[in-house]
Amino acid sequence: NLKKVNKKILTMSENQDETDKGEYKHFMFKEIVEQPYTVKNCIDEYVDSIKKNINILNFPIEPKNINKIVLIGCGTAYNSCLTAKYWFEELTSIDVEIDIASEFRYRKLKFNSNNLYIFVSQSGETADTAAALDICKKNNVKTCSIVNVIESTIARNSDWVLPIHAGIEIGVASTKAFLGQLTVLYILCLKLAFVRKDIE
């Protein structure tokens, strides 16, 4: 149709040096060794140790009004959601539900504007998770994504993004990303517990 299209240019945040195995024989071993740095990156990003404060701000819903948290993911991300469910139930007064994204897509769901739907994905491009997010957007509910790639589709389509800062991960076992997801979910859980006065 000869219409001019203005495309938005995104600069990728990854450091290409991370694609080198360096002194390690396998990427998986290298990434296991890098796990503590992932946790440190998350703590540095979200925790102010001097002021003793958790710097998670700009909630899409007033924390005290959150009725339920729905955690959605596939594979490794789903497993991190399973673990986080125990933390939210133990530390907060918020009801928690977990869904595998591929099943969430095809269920007859009742959406609530006071529910927070959290999508967990390393790449931010997981097809089923992205499709589940689209369903939530069409139903005008608030969404959050916990991803490693902040330029990804899931991150861009969410109301709120919490990066896990794991860096490039090549090993299929998803060692760094899993630990990063758990760390961010736990910090988020603590923040909600403090804000809602569930713990002092």
Predicted features along the sequence, with ranges:
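N-terminal segments that mediate ammonia production and transfer
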Residues: 1-64, 77, 86, 90-92, ...
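Glycine-rich phosphate-binding loops that contact phosphosugars or nucleotide phosphates
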Residues: 64-198
